[in-house]
Amino acid sequence: MSKQTYKVCFCFRRRYRHTVSVAPAEIKTLFDNYSDKGLMTTDLLLRFLIDVQKQDKATKEEAQDIVNASSSLLHRNGLHLDAFFKYLFAVTNSPLSSLEVHQDMDAPLSHYFIYTGHNSYLTGNQLSSDCSELPIIEALKKGVRVIELDIWPNSDEDGIDVLHGRTLTSPVELIKCLRAIREHAFDVSDYPVVVTLEDHLTPKLQAKVAEMVTDIFGEMLFTPPSGECLKEFPSPAFLKKRIMISTKPPKEYKAATDDDLVKKGRDLGDKEVWGREVPSFIRRDRSVDKNDSNGDDDDDDDDDDDDDDGDDKIKKNAPPEYKHLIAIEAGKPKGGITECLKVDPDKVRRLSLSEEQLEKASEKYAKQIVRFTQRNLLRVYPKGTRITSSNYNPLIAWSHGAQMVAFNMQGLGRSLWVMQGMFRGNGGCGYIKKPDLLLKSNAVFDPEATLPVKTTLRVTIYMGEGWYYDFPHTHFDRYSPPDFYTRVGIAGVPADTVMKKTKTLEDNWIPAWDEVFEFPLTVPELALLRIEVHEYDMSEKDDFGGQICLPVWELRQGIRAVPLRNQDGVKCRSVKLLVRLEFV
């Protein structure tokens, strides 16, 4: 037991004792129930794994492995209380049911949510940051499977740059981005990478792109049979280790001054280090859209406009080699949203809508959007006024079946944490099989419908530890140990979305909250468990202490060790919570 000294005023000091982790009362009770004379034998541990941890297929060999890993060489016949507590709080006691790919990967691409980036080359904001291949590499190393490149003629108009057009962003050469994709596409996942090209090139430069892409990607490149359109998308399993090109025609850009964009986007950035709470994680409010739309269905983010007028032009003027690259065709038919959502039985395609366009369309056409996404791909992207690279609530798009919910991966905050949480599922491969409710053709899911509760998730937050080892002792408070509290809740369909909070425990590096929360879920297939730890500060904003977001459908029941992550989504070295997860 060590002591810490904190300054008080100018000439006084206070000392606090730092205690060690001890098993919570409920853990001690469980140990007593599954032990004999202070020893949990392998047979009794196996009973515990089946009864409490709900590991129905657990074996005696697995129980013995736990004993071996948690005990000293002199006590391999079972677990004492300290060793039992050590096993429960070990990072190997994961809250996720599987850390490997375990879903069916043989369905068409349209049956999966796909980890998707927006303006993947930007290092910061949308207006003046540098363009580089480094954010692309970083995204691929995090499992992102869709990379977006805006391609423009360079200043001499004889080469191709990647940059955010009509802004002050500095360019990066296309060839650097393509080489980065080739080198890192399959660092963490063998499943396909889609490169979406926002094309602003002449036919001559398009021919150069075709040559570059073909030379650099080589046999990795997947192209459909010459002259044919895909009638159905191939599966992720079929496309393993392949790269696909998805593109749409050159576009006319609306004129907008930098000052206009700054004025519109100034209040959209996250104001706190962990990001302000996303309003639609609390409630879904459509009144803003209705009041501000003025009957105009256009979106301000012009660099994502799918217009089939341009599509006809590119097919007429583009060199054959360039057209042959396109594995996933993009297009937005004339005639408004009803035409956009028509399903062609002989052809599949990709449609892009901004977050605002999707919200407007979903007011009247929610079921049609879901039906469209059963065969076709829907990409949703941030509205153009998000110049700080902030993000939006992805659940609205996912609940309508949108596969490519495009995010600014540099836009830290709660929205990105939810995105990262979703794609921790299925082994982190970047593809999550959509739930059956979004794929039924005979009973199309209505995201706006009020549904009965399917199950209730009960979460017990026992305690946390690790901050003492990861942070200086005055990191959270100069005058005393930290005052931690935990926020726990659900991101999901509107009926399921909620956030709750534990009490604040003062002056404690190892807080033991021991509080229980229950979350009724109407659509557990689309729910994510959110946990955040903060340190209460009376005079300033609360300090960030860690966060995690996990897909509910992949949770393991029982008592689990939950490692927390920092604002970037990187796992903390030591910080973790002890929780119990139950479906009741």
Swiss-Prot record:
The keyword Amino-acid biosynthesis does not apply. One of its GO terms (molecular function) is phosphatidylinositol-4,5-bisphosphate phospholipase C activity. Residues 26-102 form the EF-hand-like domain. It is found in: Cell membrane. Its EC number is 3.1.4.11. One of its GO terms (biological process) is lipid catabolic process. It holds the Pfam family PI-PLC-Y. Its cofactor is Ca(2+). The modification Phosphoserine is found at residue 287. Residues 294-311 have a biased composition (Acidic residues). Residues 433-566 form the C2 domain. The production of the second messenger molecules diacylglycerol (DAG) and inositol 1,4,5-trisphosphate (IP3) is mediated by activated phosphatidylinositol-specific phospholipase C enzymes. This is Phosphoinositide phospholipase C 7. It comes from Arabidopsis thaliana.
